[in-house]
Amino acid sequence: RRYARNGNLGLIVIDYLQLMTVKSNSRFDEVSQISRQLKVMAKTVKAPVIALSQLSRKCEERGDKRPNNSDLRESGQIEQDADIITFIYREEVYNDKTVNKGMAELITTKFRNGEIGKDILATELQFCRFKNLSADFYYKEDEPLAGGKSRKFD
């Protein structure tokens, strides 16, 4: 809040939500309270908050390993408070024989003021970044995102 008063606050990044603590009776309530407080803080200081969250192990147990909103760990409140929820999915993590090596899906499952969908990007893991796929890349999509559509990332 001190930075916001000085006009020096453009973005708040939390890596990751479950590392934060407040006094509460249960971990579920604690994460819910943290999520609500971050939402209020973002509105108060007029700065966007990007909060990374751990996922539960449920997606590891499914055939389709793509994460969804119910996989957010320890609280459904995160889903309620978030304006945008985006997951990163890399098929090569689960299938070393995939033809989609070096690619990632950015899956937007909630976008309060926009469209949900999936963006396919190339990965440059050695530089910790994504980039647009070049024309010579082919992405074999095995299952489209329900309710959304694929988009080109600009």
Task: Please place each PLM-identified region on the residue numbering.
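Short, active-site-adjacent cap segments at secondary-structure transitions
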Residues: 19-21, 56-59
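C-terminal regions of RecA-like/P-loop NTPase motor modules
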Residues: 1-12, 36-45, 58-154
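Helical hairpin unit composed of two closely spaced alpha helices linked by a short loop
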Residues: 9-51
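Flexible loop residues that form catalytic
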Residues: 17, 55, 90
